Amino acid sequence: MSEPLLTVADSLKDRARAALGSRNLILVGLMGAGKSAVGRIVASQLGIPFIDSDHEIERVSRMTIPELFAAYGEDEFRALETRVMKRLLKGGPRVVSTGGGAFINERTRRHIIKGGVSVWLKADLDVLWERVNKRDNRPLLKTENPKQTLEGLMNARYPIYAQADLTVLSRDVRKEIMADEVLKAMIEAQKESAAS
């Protein structure tokens, strides 16, 4: 009896898993970029755990993100986020989705860079707005003109997100396609690293 042939999908997963090794894969980007949705699929494809850092922050604080912002302000929230990210990134491999501001905080960014492979899910304003406009749980968008606020966040944060190890364009396609593109970006980065 012959061995079953590997499918292209199996091969992609195996090569991406080998490229990751024992490191963490950390997804960064603005709210609505798809970090959690894509992260869950990537983790499943790689056969490693997925952790949403915002959910972990809510678990340890026993408060929602909006409650934390209201009670303690953004600075205290960012300090807690840094502590949680530092702890999450000690183990591995795993896929970690971050809150939109995590990579912007210099201390948190250092932990992310040291803790694994960072992937920026980069989306344009219209894609982000379409996704975040449907929910009312975004503390930073509680303004008179939330779309303009989102654009301001893009302008301020995109140069910092660009420091991530890899960039994958987040657009209006199925999450599974985005997950495959993350895997392909990891494989390509490993090839380039091996060639240099």
Curated annotation (Swiss-Prot):
Gene Ontology BP term (one): chorismate biosynthetic process
Transmembrane region(s): none
Protein's pathway: Metabolic intermediate biosynthesis; chorismate biosynthesis; chorismate from D-erythrose 4-phosphate and phosphoenolpyruvate: step 5/7
EC id: 2.7.1.71
Annotated ATP binding sites: 32-37, 138, 174
Cofactor(s) needed for function: Mg(2+)
Binding site residues for Mg(2+): 36
Keyword Magnesium among record annotations: yes
Chain positions recorded as substrate binding sites: 54, 78, 100, 157
Function statement: Catalyzes the specific phosphorylation of the 3-hydroxyl group of shikimic acid using ATP as a cosubstrate.
The protein's assembly and partners: Monomer.
Family: Belongs to the shikimate kinase family.
Protein name in the entry: Shikimate kinase
Gene behind this protein: aroK
